[in-house]
Regions:
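PRPP-associated nucleotide enzymes
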Residues: 1-321
Length: 321
């Protein structure tokens, strides 16, 4: 059977307001332009969406991260509904940062599983596929009843640090949940060793680091996590490894959320450099510290979209050659 030939005339890429620069970069890598759409507010504050060209029979990709405020998620849902009602052939929700992902299970009585609720909403709205980057928990893929591609930026971040040629690097997981990610990252850094923090969380905002397993004395530490929220975990870990004789401390994560006063706290912290990606519009943040470096996931997402359209393997993007 001959593969169906996909032309870019059959593809439409839309974006909401959550991260327009990333969406523009993704379209550019595909030699396309974003399809015109109105995504604004009615006078009463409700979300207004209207696609300004036909999507009938087209493969539609909607690029929208779902970070706070909740309007970003609602924009995505309404855009999906709009193109579904306009007879799109397929609708892929491209969600570089998937909000509410930390609420993937009940940790206390009478709590919601918000990640599952959001997955249900996206599916019910009419999405036929989801593409995301470094979900907080890989099992969130199972919350969807449609194909879900969980891309990873670990190779992008790993390449950056590999080219720094740090002497005596040690990759440190700031908590147990980051171990698998740190292990994958360490494989990208020649001669890197590993260490892990075992911590006790006192509350969602307050973290007590209890024990470090591994050797960091005289080494350059790279703290690896999936996202930076308040930064408290990384700052606490950085102070501890320096107390134990580490030379310098770097930190990296896919998603730079930087909640509350985290940027100020991280700027004043002993961390030498913080490397994140543009799944969120970090570069538009006011007073962004010079120590924060932003790498782009646009080529990664664009290549995944191309492979999906050409019916090629997406997982091969992350396989060792």
């Amino acid at each position: 059977m001959v593969k169906e030939i996909i032309t870019m005339d059959e593809v439409k890429i839309f974006t909401g307001n959550s991260n327009v620069p990333l969406a523009e970069s993704i379209a550019s890598y595909l030699n396309m332009k974003l399809s015109p759409a109105i995504v604004s507010r009615f006078p009463d504050g409700e979300i207004q969406v209207r696609c300004l060209e036909s999507v009938r029979g087209k493969d539609v990709f909607i690029i929208q991260s779902t970070q706070t405020p909740a309007e970003n998620l609602l924009e995505l849902l309404i855009m999906i509904d709009a193109v579904r009602r306009a007879s799109a052939r397929s609708i892929s929700a491209v969600i570089p940062f998937f909000g509410y992902a930390r609420q993937d299970r009940k940790t206390k009585s009478r709590e919601p599983i918000s990640a599952k609720l959001v997955a249900n909403l996206i599916t019910t709205a009419g999405a036929t596929r989801v593409i995301s980057v470094d979900l907080h928990a890989a099992q969130i893929q199972g919350f969807f009843d449609i194909p879900t591609d969980n891309l990873t930026a670990v190779l992008i971040l790993g390449k950056y640090f590999r080219e720094k040629n740090l002497e005596n690097p040690v990759v440190v997981a700031p908590d147990v949940g980051a171990v698998q990610r740190a292990t994958t990252f360490a494989q990208e850094i020649p001669h890197a060793t590993q260490a892990i923090f075992v911590k006790k969380r006192l509350s969602p905002e307050e973290v007590e680091t209890s024990r470090l397993i591994g050797e960091v004395e005289g080494k350059n530490v790279i703290l690896v996590d999936d996202a930076i929220h308040t930064g408290n975990t990384l700052i606490s870990a950085a102070k501890e490894v320096l107390r134990r004789g580490a030379k310098e401390v770097y930190a990296t994560a896919t998603h730079g959320i930087f909640a509350q006063d985290s940027l100020k706290n991280l700027e004043e912290s002993p961390i030498k450099e913080i490397v994140v990606t543009d799944t969120l519009p970090v570069l538009s943040r006011p007073n962004l510290p010079e120590k924060v470096k932003v790498l782009s996931v646009a080529p990664l997402i664009a290549e995944a979209i191309r492979r999906i359209l050409m019916h090629e393997s997406v997982s091969e993007l992350f396989e060792k050659k």
